[in-house]
Every structure is written in structure tokens, then in C-alpha cells.
Amino acid sequence: MKLRGNCPAKVDEKGRLKIPAVFLEELKVYGNQFYITSMTGESARIYPMRVWSEIEDKLAALPSQNQAKRKFLMRTSYYGQTVELDGQGRVLVPAVLRESAQMKGDVDVFGNLDYLEVMNHTRVVDSLKNEPYTSEDDKALEDLGI
């Protein structure tokens, strides 16, 4: 699966996000269940359940004392919830994440290869302005062969 690009969308007053059509057909190949979560509470990540299950399998192989695993699970569980796509192509963003990420009204939905990232539009614009792309970023990508 290769989700890419950005599509503006809206989160309605009930906290539902209509998945943009440009992403919906690709996602439906993986079914109607998703895991919505966050690591920071600033944005939402929407994983097809199959992709999230692969992440969980990798985590299960790590020792329970692994600090990074524990932090990851605490955050993704706190913000996370299994959701189902409704008949109108919408998912319900968990209330705790919706409040933390300020997801009301205008949002941007980014395709990040195998998951979607959803951010408050104002936060996206601020992030682009305050975190400019630099030559160090170019160098880091070059070191990765990109």
C-alpha cells in the first residue's frame, strides 16, 4: 500500500472524520477496521488494522521490560482506539485524542505510505513555518540513499 499526498478534510461536531476519497479506496483493500492513535497527542495516525497488527507482533517479540516498548504502548493505548469505517466513509476520532490534537473543523490528511496522519490545519501551517526543511535534512536523506 502506498498512501501519499495531502487532502484537506473536516472533523464534524461529533468527532467524525470523513476519509478523503483519494485515500478511501486504497484503505478499503485492508478492510473496514482501523486503529487510530498518536505518540504525542498532536496528530492522529490511522492504521489499517492489518498494519497495526504487524506493529503489535513486532512489539510482542520485545521483552516486557523494554522501556521504549512500554512508553510506546502507554501512549498509543492512551490515545488509541479501534474504529470501524461507517457507511459514509467516516471514522470516529477518540475524544481524548481529538481534544489533545485540537481536531475540530479543518484538518489535513497526509498519506504516509501505510497509514494516514491527520493534523489540525493551523498546526500544519505553523509546523511548516517553524520547522523549515534544511540542508541537514537533505544530508540525512542522502545518507539513507534517498
Placement of each model-derived feature along the sequence:
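Flexible "stalk/tail and boundary" regions
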Residues: 1-9, 13, 23-88, 96-146
